[in-house]
Swiss-Prot record:
<feature type="domain" description="Kringle 2">
    <location>
        <begin position="219"/>
        <end position="300"/>
    </location>
</feature>
<keyword id="KW-0732">Signal</keyword>
<dbReference type="Pfam" id="PF00089">
    <property type="entry name" value="Trypsin"/>
</dbReference>
<dbReference type="Pfam" id="PF00051">
    <property type="entry name" value="Kringle"/>
</dbReference>
<dbReference type="InterPro" id="IPR001254">
    <property type="entry name" value="Trypsin_dom"/>
</dbReference>
<dbReference type="Pfam" id="PF00039">
    <property type="entry name" value="fn1"/>
</dbReference>
<dbReference type="InterPro" id="IPR043504">
    <property type="entry name" value="Peptidase_S1_PA_chymotrypsin"/>
</dbReference>
<dbReference type="InterPro" id="IPR000742">
    <property type="entry name" value="EGF-like_dom"/>
</dbReference>
<keyword id="KW-0720">Serine protease</keyword>
<dbReference type="InterPro" id="IPR001314">
    <property type="entry name" value="Peptidase_S1A"/>
</dbReference>
<feature type="disulfide bond">
    <location>
        <begin position="87"/>
        <end position="98"/>
    </location>
</feature>
<keyword id="KW-0865">Zymogen</keyword>
<keyword id="KW-1015">Disulfide bond</keyword>
<feature type="propeptide">
    <location>
        <begin position="22"/>
        <end position="33"/>
    </location>
</feature>
<feature type="disulfide bond">
    <location>
        <begin position="448"/>
        <end position="523"/>
    </location>
</feature>
<feature type="disulfide bond">
    <location>
        <begin position="354"/>
        <end position="423"/>
    </location>
</feature>
<dbReference type="Pfam" id="PF00008">
    <property type="entry name" value="EGF"/>
</dbReference>
Length: 566
């Protein structure tokens, strides 16, 4: 009898795996604020999803062809590994791999890069919404007030008309997440936020996609998964076949597919990206055979867009900030000469996938390029970010006429090293800044922003441990002269900006400081943050009526283009 019990127990272990709890990855949350009732929930640290008591779910393991089966029990997620097989139906979107538990109907989707969610239905690369945002499936989660959106699966939304537990939630973009959506075809994406003891709906601060200078403004964002435009020609000029063409009966993606409407397929020949490819495409009849080609659809302008989070902590010289508020900010490090490791050198600005702008004076010691390293997506100067991207430097270019005495022509370019034609991948934490038009002239005293990891004040012994932002105003050229800067040389390649607040305590005026060099001075233009200056030099930090001096970017657009051509 004992032997039989042991055998049965061993069999259970082999089939199901050992059950365990992981309190470090799951959070026991007690939602007890205002009118909300006491609820026990579990938060899955791997997927960042929340579950109610007795809910169960699957999550993929990093190793092997197995997944974990988990359930919420008393605020803790209990999990064990289970064997899986390929799903009988293709439940996953965007090329996700479907795995079904061997002894149940539960399944899990292993998503390709750039997608997430239970069914890989969330496009992590989408940075803005088109039209009303009904098809928006990005990851923006901040309301216009700055409040964080509530999870659509929250128990407090059970009686709301739109929640993640609706039968058609997936089709509406709702689910176990807190990302902005527009399920009711309102004027723009929105979400629920908790205010004054109750959940209310509020429009999101998600940026609208800019119209490109095309005849019809038709463009795609990310990889074009949500593209629902009307373009119907490929890059070679071929006309697309209708998705219900008789020639496509043997193809996977057609107007007859069960989820065709959700994929944008139908009785038309408009370009689409139903399989999560690199960009919109279509079927074409070419050279007497059926094939497919990428479409001639331009990509929407996404530079200068951000998920701005209102700073919560005021410090000397500025405000602590999150990298998603300044996703073009780069941190440049250099190898130590006499000891292992590397040290922070300067700030930088991402202007394209493989190019970073900075200040020439940062590289006066002519470091070998392989001694430099560029970090993108980092909120804390010395702590890796969740979506951080790291690059070695292939080469850097200092302006030939840089004057190390006056800091005239204080501009440099760093070329990031990559094995492919692209380097930085766009995300909420990493994005390019818009370069200005050569004719850009902003009004005097326009409020702009700068960011960096520099010192809080000139007497500080250390650089800031966290990214900071500062709000300054553009000085008129008549106030940006040697006379106003203690006879220091000021050239036409420079501009001035500073904190113009008056009265009260002036010891906390916003300004750049040592360590911020090479970072961005950006201003809003046509709903996009646009690079106006590069942090160059100043007389002290945060002194009343003494502006900081910046490299005037409009004077170097030709130089930038000439040096970044392939």
């Amino acid at each position: 009898m004992m032997s039989a019990m042991k055998t049965e127990f061993l069999c259970v272990l082999l089939l199901c795996g050992a059950v365990f709890t992981s309190p470090s990855q799951e959070t026991y949350r007690r939602l007890r604020r205002g009118a909300r009732s006491y609820k026990v929930t579990c938060r899955d640290g791997k997927t960042q999803m929340t579950y109610r008591q007795h809910d169960s779910w699957l999550r993929p393991l990093l190793r092997g062809n197995q997944v974990e089966h988990c359930w919420c029990d008393g605020g803790r997620a209990q999990c064990h590994s289970v064997p899986v097989r390929s799903c009988s139906e293709p439940w996953c979107f965007n090329g996700g791999t479907c795995r079904q538990a061997l002894y149940s109907s539960d399944f899990v989707c292993q998503c390709p890069e750039g997608f997430m969610g239970k069914l890989c239905e969330i496009d992590a690369t989408a940075t803005c919404y088109k039209d009303q945002g009904v098809a928006y499936r990005g990851t923006w989660s901040t309301a216009e007030s700055g409040a964080e959106c509530a999870n659509w699966n929250s128990s407090g939304l059970a009686m709301k008309p739109y929640s993640g537990r609706r039968p058609n939630a997936i089709r509406l973009g709702l689910g176990n997440h807190n990302y902005c959506r527009n399920p009711d075809q309102d004027s723009k994406p929105w979400c629920y936020v908790f205010k004054a003891g109750k959940y209310i709906s509020e429009f999101c601060s998600t940026p609208a996609c800019a119209k490109v200078a095309e005849e019809d403004g038709d463009c795609y964002t990310g990889n074009g998964l949500a593209y629902r435009g009307t373009r119907s020609h490929t890059k070679s000029g071929a006309s697309c076949l209708p998705w219900n063409s008789v020639f496509l009966t043997s193809k996977i993606y057609t107007a007859w597919k069960s989820n065709a409407p959700a994929l944008g397929l139908g009785k038309h020949n408009h370009c689409r990206n139903p399989d999560g490819d690199a960009q919109p495409w279509c079927h074409v009849w070419k050279d007497r055979q059926l094939t497919w080609e990428y479409c001639d659809v331009p990509q929407c302008v996404t530079c200068g867009l951000r998920q701005y989070k209102r700073p919560q902590f005021r410090i000397k010289g500025g405000l602590f900030a999150d990298i998603t508020s300044h996703p073009w900010q780069a941190a440049i490090f250099v190898k130590n000469r006499r000891s292992p490791g590397e040290r922070f050198l300067c700030g930088g600005i991402l202007i394209s996938s493989c190019w970073v702008l900075s200040a020439a004076h940062c590289f006066q010691e002519r470091y070998p390029p392989h001694h430099l390293k560029v970090f993108l997506g980092r909120t804390y100067r010395l702590v890796p970010g969740e979506e951080e991207q790291t690059f070695e430097v292939e080469k850097y270019i200092i302006h030939k006429e840089f004057d190390d005495d006056t800091y005239d022509n204080d501009i440099a370019l760093l070329h990031l090293k990559s094995d492919s034609l692209t380097c930085a991948r766009e995300s909420a934490s990493v994005r390019t800044i818009c370069l200005p038009d050569a004719s850009l002239q902003l009004p005097d005293w326009t409020e702009c922003e700068l960011s960096g990891y520099g010192k809080h004040e000139s007497s500080s012994p250390f650089f800031s441990e966290r990214l900071k932002e500062a709000h300054v105003r553009l000085y008129p050229s008549s106030r940006c002269t040697s006379q106003h800067l203690f006879n220091r040389t000021v050239t036409n390649n420079m501009l001035c900006a500073g904190d113009t607040r008056s009265g009260g305590d002036h010891t906390n005026l916003h300004d750049a400081c040592q360590g911020d060099s090479g970072g961005p001075l950006v201003c809003m233009k046509d709903n996009h943050m646009t690079l106006v200056g590069i942090i160059s030099w100043g007389l002290g930090c945060g002194r009343k009526d003494v502006p900081g001096v910046y490299t005037k970017v409009t004077n170097y657009l030709d130089w930038i283009r000439d040096n970044t051509r392939p």
